[in-house]
Structure formats: structure tokens, C-alpha cells
């Protein structure tokens, strides 16, 4: 399993709106992508710091979601709420317990 981790800063007054967009638009669309296995959005309502973690069955599935434009379309939906540019990294999931 592989993870895309996106670190971001959101204006604290916009955290609730970011949560709504992620829950109502980003996650349902991600469920339609091949290999999608789950997502988390972690936010600090005081500082505006946030981390999005999406889980993918394989590295190929993760990269396919970027090549298809899915990742950038979803990022664009949140763009007006960001301070600065989000930082994206990829990881192999070493341990998972749910």
C-alpha cells in the first residue's frame, strides 16, 4: 500500500470550509479512482496547519491518480483556502492498523 501525504496551511477561519470540501467533494471522487483505499484530513484549527493522507493499493494506482488529473482537480477545489503552496510526498505504508 502507498500513501500520498500533502502538507498545507489553510487560513484558520477557512478550516471548516476545507473540511466540508474534503468530505463532500474530494473523498467521494477519490472513491471512484482505481486503487483508492481511504483518506484522512488532519487539521489544527488554531494554526491552520493541515495534512491530507490518501491511501492507494499500489504505487501505480497512486501515480495514475496524478497522471489522470484527479489530484490536481481536487487540489484546485481547495486552492482558494490555501496559504502558500501545498507540499506533496509519497510513502510506502509500512504498518497499518485500523
Predicted feature residues:
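Low-complexity, intrinsically disordered Gly/Pro/Thr-rich segments
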Residues: 73-77
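Short S/T/G/P-rich N-terminal loop/turn motif that feeds into the first structured element of a domain
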Residues: 1-50, 57-69, 81-98
Amino acid at each position: 500500500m502507498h500513501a500520498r501525504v500533502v502538507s498545507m496551511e489553510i487560513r484558520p477561519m477557512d478550516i471548516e470550509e476545507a473540511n466540508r470540501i474534503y468530505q463532500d467533494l474530494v473523498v467521494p471522487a477519490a472513491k471512484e479512482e482505481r486503487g483508492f483505499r481511504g483518506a484522512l484530513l488532519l487539521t489544527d484549527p488554531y494554526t491552520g496547519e493541515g495534512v491530507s493522507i490518501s491511501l492507494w493499493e499500489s504505487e501505480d494506482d497512486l501515480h495514475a491518480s496524478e497522471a489522470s488529473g484527479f489530484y490536481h482537480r481536487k487540489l484546485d477545489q481547495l486552492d482558494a483556502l490555501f496559504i502558500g503552496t501545498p507540499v506533496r510526498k509519497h510513502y510506502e505504508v509500512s504498518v497499518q492498523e485500523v
